[in-house]
Design a protein with these regions (language model features):
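Membrane-spanning beta-strands of outer-membrane beta-barrel proteins
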Residues: 86, 131, 181, 234-236, ...
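Outer-membrane beta-barrel "beta-signal"
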Residues: 384-386, 408-420
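Transmembrane beta-strand segments that form the barrel wall of outer-membrane beta-barrel proteins
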Residues: 105-116, 205-209, 256-262, 345-354, ...
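Outer-membrane beta-barrel translocator domains and adjoining extracellular loop/strand segments
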Residues: 55-60, 119-129, 160-167, 213-229, ...
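Bacterial N-terminal signal peptides that target proteins for export
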Residues: 1-12
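Detector for outer-membrane/organellar transmembrane beta-barrel domains
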Residues: 239, 244-372, 384
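C-terminal segment of classical bacterial N-terminal signal peptides
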Residues: 16-25
Length: 420
């Protein structure tokens, strides 16, 4: 009890200090406890003022804009809106302990931002974003091997585009090759290269909860809420290899990921009386590769994925329900950036996601034409950065083809970031 009560007290005081105090904390403030435990506080404050021409679909209009809304949802005249968004703002609490079993030390992390329930309607409600948990996990590590249990990124969440506006929802997230999501699960991280080796190699393995939309009215009841991935009775499995090397003139990293999961297209319960009744589990799979290369002041990075029924991982332009999400397709993005000075840099981004519309019609003849059939995203960022402060002017454009025709939306944003 003596350890637990001070820990919670310090956590509360630290949260008030970081989020509402008059003075700025130093980067990654560390609080030490008497028993050797430490608490590291990190995060950032992020604010965006933006002008949209045309509407974005599904996620939102501000820091979570990703692809254009359908033609029928677009205004034909008076298309402009001016708004602000602070929901990217994030706080992270990481507790570290001394070794408890030989060289093995536990660590616990809780991270949250303000993209909670999307129900803040104007006036007033949209100025009161709600908290949500991003990460909540506990590690046990000896330095080279880490066992993680809790909610964290799936290994498919790999390379991330640079932006000052699109952070919690990265550039092209769910709209280009930028895929992956957070799930509760069991994660294993194992260093394969020797300590100090010029080329570092790491293996990641993950078994995560199944995921997908509810398949029946029974499964979608408020007290049930069981998706077709959970109803399969099987986890999602992923394996990833990371490679990295750094020299005085060149740094690079690369990774490759494999994914498999199952979805019960009839939900919980199954007809066992009909002749020939079979299991209704649908297999889903995917592969992904990404890389980052930095020769001097220049950066080039991106990733590519191909898979089937990966909507719960934000693939296939984030489509999960039509045809039970039985969609094949691929996506890719690339971004180039150059640091002209220690403070100024310019970044350019392009990405696309292309579901296989013909294969979908062949595999799902009664599902109708696939709603979102193709998406292209483009982004340009001029960034000024000095220490923990950064400000940027960003232009984002999305062109999305629906089964009802093409649509587009544009965003110009001024964003500021202060790293705690």
């Amino acid at each position: 009890m003596r350890t637990r009560i001070p820990s919670l007290s310090v956590l509360a005081v630290a949260a008030v200090f970081v989020l509402g105090g008059a003075r700025a904390a130093t980067a990654q403030q560390v609080v030490k406890f008497g028993d050797g435990q430490t608490l590291t506080i990190s995060g950032f404050i992020n604010a965006t003022m933006f002008y949209d021409h045309g509407l974005f679909g599904s996620f939102g209009q501000g820091q979570n804009a990703e692809f254009a809304a359908a033609p029928g949802a677009q205004p034909t005249t008076d298309k402009g809106i001016f708004d602000g968004d602070v929901r990217n703002t994030r706080i992270n609490f990481t507790f570290n302990s001394t070794p408890v079993i030989g060289k093995w030390s536990p660590r616990a992390t809780l991270e949250a931002d303000f993209f909670g329930a999307f129900n803040g309607v104007p006036p007033f409600g949209d100025e009161q974003p709600q908290f949500r948990i991003r990460f909540a996990f506990v590690d046990l590590s000896n330095g080279r091997t880490t066992l993680r249990i809790g909610q964290y990124w799936s290994p498919m969440f790999g390379e991330v585009p640079v932006s000052l506006t699109h952070l919690a929802f990265p550039l092209g997230y769910g709209a280009t090759g930028m895929v992956g999501w957070r799930f509760p699960g069991v994660f294993l991280y194992q260093d394969l290269s020797a300590a100090g080796a010029p080329l570092t190699v790491q293996l990641q393995l993950a078994a995560m909860k199944g995921s997908g939309p509810a398949a029946t009215a029974r499964d979608s009841a408020a007290a049930v809420n069981v998706g077709n991935g959970e109803a399969s009775g099987l986890p999602q499995f992923e394996a990833r290899l990371n490679f990295a090397k750094k020299t005085p003139k060149l740094s690079w990293s690369a990774y490759v990921v494999g994914h498999v999961d199952w979805k019960d297209t009839t939900g919980t319960g199954r007809d066992t009386t009909s002749t020939g009744a079979q299991d209704s589990n649908m297999s889903a799979w995917g592969v992904e590769a990404g890389a980052n290369i930095q020769p001097g002041s220049f950066t080039l990075h991106g990733n590519f994925y191909y898979g089937k029924a990966l909507g719960q991982q934000f693939a296939h332009i984030t489509q999960t329900t039509q045809g039970h999400g039985d969609i094949r397709g691929w996506g890719a993005w690339a971004q180039a950036g150059y640091d002209f000075t220690p403070h100024w840099s310019l970044w350019a981004y392009a990405g696309m996601d292309q579901p296989d519309v013909q294969r979908f019609a062949q595999d799902n003849p009664t599902a109708g034409a696939l709603a979102r059939q193709l998406n292209h995203d483009y982004d340009a960022l001029l960034r000024f950065r000095a220490g923990r402060y950064a400000v940027g002017l960003e232009y984002f454009r999305s062109v999305t083809r629906y089964n009802t025709g093409p649509a587009s939306a544009d965003q110009v944003a001024l964003s500021v970031l202060y790293t705690l």
